[in-house]
Amino acid sequence: QPPIARSMLQYRFDRLSGAERNAAAHGYRGAMFPWESGASGEEDTPVWALTGPFEQHITADVGIAAWNYYCVTHDKYWLQSEGYPLLKETADFWTSRVTRNGPGRYDIVNVVAADEFAQNVDDNAFTNAAAREDLEDASAAARVLGTAPDPDWANVAKNIPILKFPDGTVREYAGYNGQQTKQADVELLGYPLHAISDSSTIRRDLDYYGARIANGPAMTQSIYAILQERLGMPETAFATFEKGYRSHEVAPFDTISEVAGDTNVYFATGAGGFLQTMLYGFGGLEITPQGIVQRPTRLPAEWRSLTLTGIGPHLKTYVIRSSDQKPKAAAH
């Protein structure tokens, strides 16, 4: 539903000046969006929480969302007037945020990771990968508009490190050595980011971190289910998907709690994960610069078909059918 997506980005654009003030207050250029935004756009996170000043991947998330909206709608007027300003200012933030320690070592130090057990760490996998993608998206947006991108965006993007263990498993942050994690972090590099596409690396990361996740927020199982489906494991994906929402359902309205057995409802992030599993996992959808496309996908044996309606600006319907284990997909 592009109008709803646009309204969310409109909220960010209308508060861009507040994000610019926030960046300046921390000694950076560009825009630094708050972790918990007040109506004014100022940081509203309680002062005792480290997420406010340090969980800075939110800034990259805003930029990536702007580019995704353009990719779906191809609305150049919007990109020129609102999308590119968001992308430019968030990219400028990262060029000032990195510590330039030489080629391949433009480190992002002292952050709270997407895995919020990891606080005040350096070179967090998700933060670094999201910053890289934000910088690359800003350059792509500039080229769409016929504007020369700041060459430092590409320079910084290619020098932000993604750390790995000797066997190729992505390391969550500098010094990470197998500690328990709260929620998905490294796993996010395969989806929704595009930092890792190699199936063997994604599988290795899922196996390694899946054994280390605590009983955390509901959205983690959604990421695992999406990636498992994309790896050609529909039955494993279905079991993960079902676990992710069944264990978090709260009567009488079947709302989704933040943590299994918790009464903190309604947890919108968990509900969003449920929806994304249907669209980008079992539904096979993917946002690309050419628009929404559909990948080959397989349904679990428990389902005969899956119908997705009202997708994208043209309100397409996608039907995925399972027949003799040879599912078909069609768009109308």
Predicted regions and their residues:
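Active-site core of glycosidic bond-cleaving carbohydrate-active enzymes
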Residues: 1-16, 64, 71, 81, ...
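Short, glycine/acidic-rich hinge or "gate" loops at secondary-structure transitions
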Residues: 24-26, 79-82, 99-108, 145-150, ...
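Glycine- and aromatic-rich loop/turn segments at beta-sheet edges
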Residues: 20-33, 95-112, 116, 162-171, ...
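Non-catalytic C-terminal accessory modules of carbohydrate-active enzymes
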Residues: 47, 228, 235-332
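Acidic/His metal-coordination segments adjacent to aromatic residues that form catalytic metal sites
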Residues: 35-54, 108-123, 251-263
